[in-house]
């Protein structure tokens, strides 16, 4: 397949990793506000464009810097970061994945990422593993005068070399750091992120009437005993099965629990697909938000995502103008309906290739870069992204890694098999 230079728009967060690659256009996006408008009006150059003829036409974004799908193919494909956070502040994430929605083909591909995946904090992060980022974002160095994050090459000690103003340290953005890992270490754009607290996942499953899974053996979940076989698990039991049951906080046990997570996610997908929009979200006669997702989004454990006009537009493949006044519950419910229209046999799951390795005395999950490149090109690259040894830079601790399992499954094969009663049986 021929590759088009304009297919990935690079924002400031990914610029450092790609600044010498002229086949992709690096863009610096600075937070939208009055200052940006003034700078644009006065014609100050804010963007370092390498290839002006083939770059996509981009409008000002209402968001922090990161890499998203280029506008010219955004109607065909979108990439999302999915995750579930741990139970307590400071805990590693329970679940993490990248999802590619090929709108044109009507299919979805999900690559599950072990939470112990090694990222190396020397690459500009505060921690060594991706699952620890959520509660440990890298502090940001900010120039209040220019109203911009300042990269290392623009700092002169504690002063912004560009304007001479003093720099200040601010709390970083966890979601931005997560996205930056995917941008800079795996060469993928991210159009939005969807991060749900563990308690929120339990509430969602409960509201949908539970999820049906097949248990391989007798287990105790949420204080209740279940025999081997097919059972409907309600919120707390389903979440325990998906994230903590038999999990030993090791890379090996993380891969094992990913198979259980697929079971729960397949059943959850099936339940949401059976819902109508009015089941998920509506306003009552008093204007109060109701519905399954309406209740979740207005409760104590809502789904977190980029709620700007651009973020909502990228979820739904609509214009920013159409997304501007859309309520968050409405946007998420519309997104859920869209995803529910993708048949389960068109939803493919795989695991990021790698193996357990030692980083000092700590066991982490180290990728097999060659296999990562092969998997991402096969599963997530129908529109000519550059996914190669130059863009997939994730640290690999073992330079002679073992071959990982590259098998994929579709969600329809994960659901329990229920026998149809023979004719005449009740």
Segments predicted by a language model, with ranges:
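Flexible, polar/acidic helix-loop-strand segments at domain edges
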Residues: 200-304, 409, 414-419, 423-426
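Second-shell loop/turn segments in exported
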Residues: 86, 160-172, 186-192, 246-256, ...
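Entry/capping segment at the start of metal-dependent catalytic domains
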Residues: 6-21, 26-123, 244, 335-336
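Amphipathic, coiled-coil-like alpha-helical scaffolding segments used for oligomerization/assembly
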Residues: 145-227, 326-331
């Amino acid at each position: 397949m021929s590759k088009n230079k304009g297919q990935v728009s690079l924002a400031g967060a990914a610029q450092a990793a790609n600044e010498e690659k002229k086949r992709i256009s690096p863009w610096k996006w600075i937070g939208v506000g009055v200052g940006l408008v003034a700078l644009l009006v006065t014609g100050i150059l804010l963007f370092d464009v390498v290839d002006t003829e083939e770059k996509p036409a981009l409008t000002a974004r209402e968001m922090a810097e990161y890499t998203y799908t280029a506008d010219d193919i955004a109607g065909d494909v979108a990439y999302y970061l999915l995750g579930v956070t741990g139970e307590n502040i400071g805990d590693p994430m329970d679940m993490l994945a990248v999802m590619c929605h090929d709108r044109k083909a009507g299919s979805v591909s999900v690559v599950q990422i072990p939470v112990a995946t090694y990222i190396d904090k020397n690459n500009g992060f505060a921690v060594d593993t991706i699952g620890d980022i959520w509660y440990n974002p890298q502090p940001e160095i900010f120039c209040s005068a220019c109203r911009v994050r300042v990269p290392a090459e623009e700092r002169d000690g504690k002063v912004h070399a560009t304007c001479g103003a003093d720099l200040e340290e601010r709390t970083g953005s966890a979601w931005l750091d997560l996205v930056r890992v995917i941008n800079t270490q795996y060469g993928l754009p991210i159009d939005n992120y969807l991060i749900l607290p563990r308690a929120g996942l339990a509430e969602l499953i409960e509201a949908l009437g539970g999820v049906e899974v097949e248990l391989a053996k007798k287990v105790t979940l949420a204080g209740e005993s279940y025999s081997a076989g097919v059972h409907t698990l309600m919120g707390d039991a389903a979440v325990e099965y998906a994230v903590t049951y038999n999990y030993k906080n090791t890379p090996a046990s993380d891969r094992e629990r990913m198979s259980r997570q697929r079971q729960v996610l397949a059943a959850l997908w099936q339940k949401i697909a059976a819902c109508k929009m009015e089941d998920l979200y509506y306003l009552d006669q008093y204007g109060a938000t109701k519905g399954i997702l309406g209740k979740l989004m207005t409760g104590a454990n809502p789904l977190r995502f980029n709620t700007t006009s651009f973020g909502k537009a990228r979820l739904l493949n609509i214009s920013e103008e159409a997304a501007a006044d859309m309520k968050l519950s409405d946007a998420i419910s519309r997104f859920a309906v869209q995803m529910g229209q993708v048949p389960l046999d068109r939803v493919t799951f795989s695991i990021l290739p790698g193996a357990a390795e030692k980083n000092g005395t700590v066991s982490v999950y180290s990728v097999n870069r060659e296999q990562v490149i092969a998997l991402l090109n096969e599963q997530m690259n129908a529109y000519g992204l550059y996914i190669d040894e130059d863009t997939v830079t994730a640290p690999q601790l073992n330079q002679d890694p073992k071959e990982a399992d590259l098998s994929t499954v579709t969600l329809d094969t994960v659901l329990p098999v229920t026998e149809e009663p023979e004719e005449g049986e009740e």
